Swiss-Prot record:
One of its GO terms (molecular function) is structural constituent of ribosome. Pfam families: Ribosomal_S14 (PF00253). The gene is rpsN. Keywords: Ribonucleoprotein, Ribosomal protein, RNA-binding, rRNA-binding. Signal peptide: none annotated. HAMAP family: Ribosomal_uS14_1. InterPro entries: Ribosomal_uS14 (IPR001209), Ribosomal_uS14_bac/plastid (IPR023036), Ribosomal_uS14_CS (IPR018271). This is Small ribosomal subunit protein uS14. Part of the 30S ribosomal subunit. Contacts proteins S3 and S10. Belongs to the universal ribosomal protein uS14 family.
Length: 101
C-alpha cells in the first residue's frame, strides 16, 4: 500500500487539474495564436505561469485504484500488476485464468 499522504496528494492534484483545465486551455490557445500581438501573448504566458504548479496535467501520476501503487499500472484497468494478479487468482476478473503450457 502506498502512503495515505501520497494518495491524498495525488487526489488534490487531480482536483486542481480539473478546476483549472479550462483556464489553462484558454491561455495556451492565446499563447499559440500567431495572429495576436506579441505583447498580448506574453501577458497570457505570465498569467499561465501564475497558475498553481499542481494544476498542470503533466504533474499527475497514474496510481492503482486499489492500492495506490504508482508503478506497473495498467491504464485500461486502472490497477497495478500486483492487484491484477490478486484479483485474477481469486477469480474476480471474468475470463482470466492461470496460464499453463
Amino acid at each position: 500500500m502506498a502512503k495515505k499522504s501520497m494518495v491524498a496528494r495525488e487526489k488534490k492534484r487531480e482536483a486542481l487539474v480539473a478546476k483549472y483545465a479550462a483556464k489553462r486551455a484558454e491561455l495556451k490557445e492565446i499563447i499559440n495564436n500567431k495572429e495576436l500581438e506579441m505583447e498580448e501573448r506574453f501577458r497570457a504566458s505570465l498569467k499561465l505561469a501564475k497558475l498553481p504548479r499542481n494544476s498542470s496535467a503533466v504533474r499527475l501520476h497514474n496510481r492503482c485504484q486499489l492500492t495506490g501503487r504508482p508503478h506497473a499500472y495498467y491504464r485500461k484497468l486502472k490497477i497495478s500488476r500486483i492487484a491484477l494478479r490478486d484479483l485474477g487468482s481469486s477469480g474476480q476478473i471474468p475470463g482470466m485464468v492461470k496460464s499453463s503450457w
